[in-house]
């Protein structure tokens, strides 16, 4: 189940609120320019190729208006899962929107907005658009299973700018 847990940066052990209804999650995040929605699933065969996954959601991708898309797959048997997890746990910003659609699995995107942290557990059929410049990090868990579409403004993609803030170490991760 998708949820958002809202924390004060002063109390990383206890969320101020936890929301599980999609409408509540949407409105809470929309107050900060973050877009969250659920897409209708498209039929995909087990073992679908990247091209098949992109084709299955082509209408939705086109409607968003981004120029490039890639499929990101990380599972528990990925040879670099530990390195990838550690890398994504560093707080970062991007000069363009961070756009992810979950085809399968789950992950925890955590946004640092002012004096609050919004931990959003995304799962299959969730779309998340984090506006450019919003500090955030991502936890795929110790035994990851996530397949996402990542959308970009340009074919070159986007390079993160690490903030150097170690705030992510203070807040619960996906497995906590």
Please state what every model-predicted region is.
Residues 1-66:
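N-terminal leader/capping segments at the start of a protein or of a new domain
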Residues 38, 70-73, 150:
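Structural signal for conserved beta-strand scaffold positions within catalytic alpha/beta enzyme cores
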Residues 71-95:
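Conserved short histidine dyad/triad with adjacent acidic residue
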Residues 92-113:
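Short, conserved beta-strand element in jelly-roll/cupin
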Residues 111-114, 119-121, 140-141, 160-162:
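A short secondary-structure junction signal
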Residues 139-176:
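Double-stranded beta-helix
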């Amino acid at each position: 189940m998708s949820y958002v847990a809202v924390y004060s940066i002063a109390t990383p052990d206890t969320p101020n609120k936890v929301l599980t209804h999609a409408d509540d999650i949407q409105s809470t995040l929309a107050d900060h320019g973050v877009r969250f929605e659920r897409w209708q699933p498209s039929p995909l065969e087990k073992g679908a190729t990247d091209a098949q996954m992109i084709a299955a959601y082509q209408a939705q991708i086109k409607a968003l208006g981004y120029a490039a898309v890639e499929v990101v797959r990380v599972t528990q048997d990925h040879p670099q899962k530990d390195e990838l997890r550690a890398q994504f746990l560093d707080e970062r910003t991007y000069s363009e929107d961070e756009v992810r659609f979950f085809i399968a699995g789950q992950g925890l995107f955590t946004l640092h907005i002012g004096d609050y942290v919004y931990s959003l557990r995304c799962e299959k059929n969730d779309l998340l658009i984090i506006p450019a410049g919003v500090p955030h990090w991502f936890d795929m868990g110790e035994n990851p299973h996530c397949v996402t579409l990542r959308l970009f403004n340009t074919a070159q993609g986007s390079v993160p700018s690490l903030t150097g803030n170690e705030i992510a170490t203070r807040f619960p991760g996906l497995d906590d």
